[in-house]
Amino acid sequence: DVLLGVHCCGNTDWSIFTEIDTIDIINFDAFGFLDRLVLYADNLKRFLKRGGILCWGIVPTQDFSGCETTDLLVRDIKDGIASLTKKGLDRDLLLENLLVSPSCGLGTLDIEKSAKIFKLLLDVSLSIRKTL
């Protein structure tokens, strides 16, 4: 099977993506826009129940300073999951359908910065697997 995904590195009307039945993965900038995605909890609930996957773009790219920490980014994901759970989404379903990625593309970044971003992303992924 080939999954179909969409990425939006800004804010949008997320119902556009959640209501398209052929979209399997929604990749969003969780670092910059998680608070706005939470506003679409009902749409996300339906999306996840039909097997949709949320890809949390948690490691910043253009705004990457090098001061970001694994603990801080994992806390942001935990806080996001808690916010969505309070809005009625099933925590287990969120965790079963969770991917992580950089917040946006790395095409304009140098190799050194890109490598640091992917190292941090790996650390976030490993921490989530252990703690959530």
Predicted feature locations:
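Distinct, well-ordered alpha-helical segments
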Residues: 10-21, 44
